[in-house]
Amino acid sequence: VAKYVKDGRLQKLLSFQTLYIGISPYNGPSIYTIIPMIESIYGVWFIKGGMFTMAKAMASLFEELGGKINYNCAVEEVLIQNGKSGGLSVDQQKIKSDYVVCNADFPYAMKNLIKESTYKGKYTDKKIDSMKYSCSVVLMYLGLKKKIDGLKVHNIIFADDFDRNISDIFQGNDPKDPSIYIYASTKADSSLAPQNKEALYVLVPVPDLSARKKRWTDEEISEYKKVIFSKMKKIDGLKDIENLVEYEKIYTLNDFESRFNAYNGATFGLAPTLGQSNYFRPHNKFMPIENLYFCGSSVHPGAGVPIVLTSAKLAAAELRRDVGSL
């Protein structure tokens, strides 16, 4: 970007989007500069009710088509027999199936759900540990007791020293002066909060576990919340942010790792480096095991909600192709 745009503010505006997929704008493949172009020229879709509406709609369609969803079940293993996936071990019970589609984070699945090293292919435990991972985030969901006129739908507060900010993230240091993205969903959809109140999604890129080398302590989370709030006070109406919050939920790499099985707490999965993109990214059809398919942010084509949905479409297409060949 700097080759064509000399103003440092515009450079940040046109390059920070690589953080949407957890990679440094200084090291990411230049193809990702297409993101701000798409946003500016075509815009982005908004789903009334938020992304949970998408999840509910997909679940509803799945059930309409005859599918059954089992909630609150721990998947322990992909069962393999004679080189074919034969079902799952769930809560210590074996459930047989002809095909398995796995949307668990690929590195986690390789290390925990595929038990026999024979069937891991090139993705051995050593290989998984040596791969490059995206950054993590500190994610805050905040409910405010009143409307804030100074907020837009999308709000970005850049670090004063953006270069240092990015360097800290990918060298394992919690940024002391972070860049912050604030999504005020209620500015686009008032149904997402009670009347005259505001719902905020606050995202702060930070190191993943492979870079940070340690999990967050409660004390560190509490202190970093102060750093984030201090930064948010730059927005008109948020000078007393501490007194406005009546609901708060904070996620760190600890939660992404424990709750969502994101390997290394890397929010966006495997980093989309040149050597981990396109053909070189884990495929949607897992060749070492017949009838096993993957979707999600760590497999082709990559991270981000629209891209992960595309990943699911590709996995479904591979499955349909194989079913049709029977």
For every predicted segment, state its role:
Residues 101, 142, 202, 232, ...:
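Hydrophobic, well-ordered secondary-structure elements that form the walls
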Residues 34-85:
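Helical element adjacent to the flavin cofactor pocket in flavoenzyme catalytic cores
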Residues 7-21, 177-181, 238-301:
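A glycine-rich dinucleotide-binding beta-alpha-beta segment and adjacent secondary-structure elements
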Residues 297-319:
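A conserved FAD-binding loop/helix module that cradles the flavin
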Residues 145-251:
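C-terminal segments that line or cap access tunnels to active or ligand-binding sites in enzymes
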Residues 2-54:
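Conserved redox-cofactor binding core of oxidoreductases
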Residues 46, 76-194:
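Mid-domain catalytic core of redox enzymes
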